[in-house]
Amino acid sequence: MPLMKTKPTSPGRRSMVKVVNPDLHKGKPFAPLLEPQFQKAGRNNNGHITTRHKGGGHKHHYRVVDFKRNDKDGIPAKVERLEYDPNRSANIALIVFADGERRYIPAAKGMTVGQSLMSGSEAPIKSGNNLPIRNIPVGSTIHCVEIMPGKGAQVARSAGGSAVLLAREGVYAQVRLRSGEVRRVLIECRATIGEVGNEEHSLRVIGKAGANRWRGIRPTVRGVAMNPVDHPHGGGEGKTGEGRVPVSPWGTPTKGYRTRRNKRTTSMIVQRRQKR
């Protein structure tokens, strides 16, 4: 997919870089797989802000994406078209099964219209096919990896994402994630062969603040620009630094401080991710 720089007809378009994919469907999405999506603007049921820097943005439907792919084993399918999805960084593919049913799945790297796909333990080792990890060769690049069997893919789902199957030991397999973390998963969990497509998504330049507002992202104000009542970094005469270890608005250290508290799954992590 080529990157396109826009002509500098305005300050906002001067540095804008877009990812252009001529293979994407230019019409409307498949209506039976759409659901309404209501803007929460980062608020909970009491109207209190629980996630900062969210609000506004263009209204859009949710595309129902099949992350499980476990109830059509052995039924061949074909890629009908590739589509843009405003809810995720990756593109999605509309596939049609031999029995006529249509579903959305994340589009793998190199996926083309008309490509044949299959899921199940008998599926060939080919990009876009979904298999249990026990049937995938060691060393394969995979994406859309399940952590719990039957729950659906939870790992390596964003644009350009992937993982590597390192080994199988008994009922567990070891998978290395992009972060460098090595994690154990049950061999009954499923994964898709290949990488997630739209890998150039990280190279785009939005060009102007308004483009983020279209996406529902509000401005982020620095703590040192606030008052002491609003942030631990706030206050001071003139321009001042934090004067302490950088922390969040609630006092938690923000740079390199480990906040993981899920002891239940700690035993599944063989090697923690590398420090950057």
Swiss-Prot record:
GO cellular component, as recorded: large ribosomal subunit
UniProt cross-references to InterPro entries, sorted A to Z: NA-bd_OB-fold, Rib_uL2_dom2, Ribosomal_uL2, Ribosomal_uL2_bac/org-type, Ribosomal_uL2_C, Ribosomal_uL2_CS, Ribosomal_uL2_dom3, Ribosomal_uL2_RNA-bd_dom
Top-level division of the source organism's lineage: Bacteria
Keywords assigned: Ribonucleoprotein, Ribosomal protein, RNA-binding, rRNA-binding
Keyword Electron transport: no
Keyword Iron: no
Composition bias, Basic and acidic residues: 230-242
Molecular function as annotated in GO: rRNA binding; structural constituent of ribosome; transferase activity
A Gene Ontology biological process term: cytoplasmic translation
PROSITE patterns found in the cross-reference section: RIBOSOMAL_L2
Record-annotated disulphide pairs: none
Region of interest: Disordered: 224-276
Assembly, per entry: Part of the 50S ribosomal subunit. Forms a bridge to the 30S subunit in the 70S ribosome.
Family, per entry: Belongs to the universal ribosomal protein uL2 family.
PANTHER family the record matches: LARGE RIBOSOMAL SUBUNIT PROTEIN UL2M, RIBOSOMAL PROTEIN L2
Functional description taken from the UniProt entry: One of the primary rRNA binding proteins. Required for association of the 30S and 50S subunits to form the 70S ribosome, for tRNA binding and peptide bond formation. It has been suggested to have peptidyltransferase activity; this is somewhat controversial. Makes several contacts with the 16S rRNA in the 70S ribosome.
Protein name: Large ribosomal subunit protein uL2
